[in-house]
Every structure is written in structure tokens, then in C-alpha cells.
Amino acid sequence: ALGLRAFTLFRQKRMALFFIFSMCLGICLQITNGFASPFIFSFGGIPEYADTFGVQHANILISISQISETFCILLIPFFLGRFGIKRVMLIAMLAWVFRFGFFALGNPGSGVWLFVLSMLVYGVAFDFFNVSGSLFVDKETDISIRSSAQGLFMMMTNGLGATIGTLSAQAVINRFVYALPETASGQEVIAGWNTCWYIFAAYALVVAALFAIFFKYKHVVKDECGR
């Protein structure tokens, strides 16, 4: 009644690996949800960037991520049919590498285009794993526990993964982000964010590599295209 039968899926190696990697991607999701805004706003203490559009309208800049997310859903049927579920999920993992990497390299001034690319690639990073992952669960589980399995998938990504992501990302940020001496105008300058984003990008790259090596799945065109 409580959906606990879904936990028996951990007895299957492929499903266990899938749920573990789902948790790992949930960590990435929480990193970007929790710290993208503070990162962009931190440029406000630097005179060169204080009056830029990115700093003054950071929420509008970040909203490009949601727009991208909406349009990337339309790409999923094509990519699933062309590349299969495993490769689509791997593309999502690599997209997280670019999401974090563009943050590390960009700035709200001359490098704002890198921020825009980071927002655009978010749609691939989010949709390609969450939607294809849900389809994978639906296909691989018995109808009697399918709903519970979907709940377990959400728990691993938005529950356990999000919790670990919040705690671990905060630990990294507390370690590497620091305040520089105040400027002549009395503004506080925050530094060290780039290091954090490189660490997060490296983490996503390691997860993608491990997924490519250990997660086994054979693409069958007629099953995944619905033909």
C-alpha cells in the first residue's frame, strides 16, 4: 500500500544502477537550483559588472533555463528514436558538464553569452534525463509496481539526490568562496565561485563516464520509437 515493493527493484543490477545514477543527477539539479542566482548576484560587488543586465536582471537571465526546458521536451522523441534511452541520458549528463563549465568561464559582461549558453543547455540536462528516465522506469517495471517505481525515481532525484546536493554543494562553496576586502565604495566582492563550478563540472563528468561504462542497455528502435 505504501509502495515499498518498488524497493525490490534494487535487486536488479540495471535498475539499481539506474536509481543510483538518478540520485547523482539529482545532486546536479540541486546545485544549479540553489546556487545559480547567488552566483550571478555576487558579481554586483564588482564595479565592472554591477550595472550589467545579467546582474540587474539575474532572474530574467535564469528564466531562459525554463524556456529552454520547455522547448527541449519537443526534441526528446527524435533523440530517443535516433540514439536510444542510454545515449539520451548520457547526453543529459554531459550537458550538466557544460552547464557548470559555462558558469565557470562566463561573467555578466563580455562573457554573458556563456551564461546564456549555460541556461540553454539546462533544458537538455534536465529534460533528457528526467523524461527519458521516467520512460525507462515505465518500460522496465511490471505494471503492478510501476507507479511506485516512478515515485522511487522521483525520490532518488528530487529527494535523496537534492538533499545530498544541497549539503555537498554548500560544503564546497563554504570551502572555496570567500570575501575580498571591500572596495572604495564599500561594496563586498565575492571570489572563488569559478573553482566551485569547475569542481561541479568535474563531478558531472565523472558521473557521465561511470554511467557510460557500467550502465548496460541495448537500443531497440521499434520499442523506443513506438513502432
Regions found by a protein language model. Give the residues of each.
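Juxtamembrane intracellular "pre-TM" segments in multi-pass secondary transporters
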Residues: 1-19, 45-46
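Loop-to-transmembrane helix entry/capping segments in MFS-fold secondary transporters
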Residues: 55-56, 141-154
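Intracellular juxtamembrane helix-capping segments at the cytosolic ends
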Residues: 128-142
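Multi-pass alpha-helical transporter architecture, strongest
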Residues: 193-227
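Short amphipathic helix-loop junctions that connect adjacent transmembrane helices
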Residues: 34-58
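A membrane-interface helix-boundary motif in multi-pass transporters
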Residues: 171-204
